[in-house]
Amino acid sequence: AYWSFDDKKLIFQSNNNNWGVECDQMFIMDFDDTFDKSQPKMVSTGNGRTTCSYFLPDNEHFIYASTHLKDDNCPEAPLRKEGKYVWPIYDSFDIFISDLEGNITGQLTNEKGYDAEATISPHGDKIVFTSTRNGDLDLYTMNIDGSNVKQITFDLGYDGGAFFSPDGSKLIFRSSRPKTEKEIKENKGLLDQGLVQPTNMELYICDSDGKNLRQLTDLGNANWSPVFHPSGKKILFSSNFEAERGFPFNLYMIDLDGKNLTRV
């Protein structure tokens, strides 16, 4: 779930059968809604699968990724491949702008491959997203209208879940970067099948144009969902690096120089 810029609403995805959906769709709520006697308002098309919604600064529109242009039906969501936990990377995902009534007002991507995981700069002028348009899962930026697309990460592996710093000058993201010949072969083999294995990810930080890229964590296991603290001086993230069997995940805070790791 993500806050609106005025902190009054939340937008999130759900496949709650009690709300009449079986495939992830986007819903909006006031921050204090409880849904004891009601259900949240669906603001996506109700077709295909959706992911990664984020409010625009006007609080009247949002972006999200959806597969509905390719197929109204819900695409398969495999959880394991040869015993390994995997995420599907649907090449039918594109990024759209919608109003709060669920009306799509613009399509921002139309390239072959996966386009998703989009978030917006605090200034409301730039979008960062993950795409496979070059054959790998890299980060790109574009203007709020979909123009001026630029690739900003280039190393082999999965770069995703990027967020801007409060001043818009930096990005924090999760990355799974294979290094050995075996890891590279497995990574490419999974991606050829539209899959990625998210069990070994570290956090990386860079300028918003991709410069000054550096690895922030080296903890092992899955370190993900990083966001900047409002001060811009720390990163809050989720990790299972202390877990013996993959669970539980806990929240941690770390300085931008990788020091002072603290479990929250």
Labelled PLM ranges:
Residues 1-9:
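Mature N-terminal segment immediately following signal peptide/propeptide cleavage
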Residues 5-6, 57-58, 122-123, 166-167, ...:
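Residue-level detector of Asp-centered blade-edge/turn motifs that repeat once per structural unit
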Residues 10, 62, 127-128, 171, ...:
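Hydrophobic beta-strand positions that form the internal "hydrophobic ladder"
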Residues 13-26, 44-50, 65-95, 107-115, ...:
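A flexible loop/linker signature enriched in serine peptidases of the S9 family
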Residues 31-35, 99-103, 143-147, 207-211, ...:
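Short loop/turn segments that connect beta-strands within beta-propeller blades
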Residues 38-41, 105-106, 149-150, 213-214, ...:
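A structural motif specific to WD40 beta-propellers
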Residues 222-223, 262-264:
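Conserved blade-ending motifs and adjacent loop-strand segments that build the rim/top face
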